[in-house]
Amino acid sequence: MNPVPATCIRIERLSKTFRGQSTPALQAIDLAVAEGEFVALVGASGCGKSTLLRLIAGLEAPSEGQVCLDGRPVQGPGCDRAVVFQDYSLYPWLNVLENVRFCRSLRAHTRDASESEVNSAVERAYALLELMGLDEVRTRYPNQLSGGMRQRVAIARALMAQPRVLLMDEPFGALDAQTREVMHELILRLFEIERSTIVFVTHDVEEAVYLADRVVVLAPQPGRIDSIHPVALPPPGARHPDLKLAPEFLRQKKTVLDRIRATSGVQRDLDKLSRLAELSRRDRRPDAKPATGTH
């Protein structure tokens, strides 16, 4: 019997209301994320996915409740958490290697790191560049790279500090479909090697089910957890693109998508359109009686 993983992130009664807003962006969120777990957050626009990620990162302060990492309340950003955003956030004046090493180099300068620590950081940087397929472009600058390559640099930089938690906010949303699929395989390989705990925000249900151990559906206005879906598929490290065609994968994708539609009002709108289409078909029948008004 495998031991139960320890809880890495615990979110308790977490709420966030932004200044000038009457409706909370998030309300009464309770969630536990296990050590080494990959959790995806999905939901309609405005459900608070990115806000929840920023609260875990310590980039926003909660209005109520708390986020705990290893039992300690999150008070702000920390080296135990790294964030990858959709817009890459690379330093344009630094080349690939310098971008990857930046945060680790800054820490070394501020606390007078030993020679062995510096050497270890250099070795890790080169290892990450090789793992991410960046070793041949390490002297190039961000404006000389494709979107997919820039996101690889951002992920490598996030992993340099060996964070306990990797937070990813729509990291592949701006990439074309082919590049996104390549990045899926890359992130699964990294997850298997690094074993970081990952919280991943996406609007793509197929992406969420393919990558994650669990998918959390958030409902909007106010943002709250609607449902949590364990992914009953091979573990993330053993998944392959062909899995997306498997009946069980398609069933789980539909289950999550149905919940998003239900919470966002999309299904209600689709039902109205179906009713309108039926009325239109009926009115076009030869034997249909014209509608009459009351005077």
Predicted regions and their residues:
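A short, flexible loop at the N-terminus of ABC-type nucleotide-binding domains that lies
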Residues: 2-8, 16-28
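The feature captures the beta-strand-to-loop junction immediately N-terminal to the Walker
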Residues: 42-44
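Helix-to-loop junction immediately C-terminal to a conserved catalytic motif
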Residues: 57
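Conserved ABC transporter NBD signature motif
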Residues: 65-77
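Hydrophobic anchor residue at the start of the ABC signature
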Residues: 84, 155
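Conserved ABC ATPase "signature" region
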Residues: 101, 105-108, 113-137, 189
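Conserved ABC ATPase signature
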Residues: 141-145, 149
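A short, proline-enriched helix->beta-strand linker immediately N-terminal to the Walker B motif
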Residues: 160-164
